[in-house]
Amino acid sequence: MKLQIFNTKLGLLAAKIYWKSWRHLGLSEDEIVSIALHAEHDSKKRYDPKYGLSFETYLKLNGANFIKSSYRSLMNKVDDWIGFKDMKTLEEQNTVSYTPENYLRSVEFREMVHLAFKKAKNEDERQVFALYVKGYKNLEIAKKLNLTTRRVRYLISIFKDHIKVLTKRYGY
């Protein structure tokens, strides 16, 4: 089911940012829209009317930054999980709240990442996931870790598939 976006300006902004900088990540239209909605929600918290701007103008001026930072924070959360923290710390950080902001911290997400990790044969192949979320391209990852590009593509596709399961489940 497609997400609906009611703020046309924000939708266009999200599309523009997607085509300029996120094409290589293979995000779906729904994922872009959900990042845009998250950014809009974020920007409402930071908006201060005392400066005389309407929220629409403020969003137009700062929307791109909010969308980028929302995506960056999403990827940082993923990177934190991939950073091989000890299990006790992961348990302490776990939350029961399945809001779009918190679902990445759920046990379910950790299990999905572990399923993807099981496909990796060694520590170098596990590093593929960490480099991918940091924005490295497939070829760069292959050269850096001395793996074939085919193997890198395979591991990344598995990782994306597991993330998409959660994305569909939580709508973010």
From Swiss-Prot:
InterPro entries: RNA_pol_sigma-70_dom (IPR014284), RNA_pol_sigma_r3/r4-like (IPR013324), WH-like_DNA-bd_sf (IPR036388). It comes from the Bacteria. GO terms for molecular function: DNA-binding transcription factor activity. GO terms for biological process: DNA-templated transcription initiation. This is Uncharacterized protein MG428 homolog. It comes from Mycoplasma pneumoniae (strain ATCC 29342 / M129 / Subtype 1) (Mycoplasmoides pneumoniae).
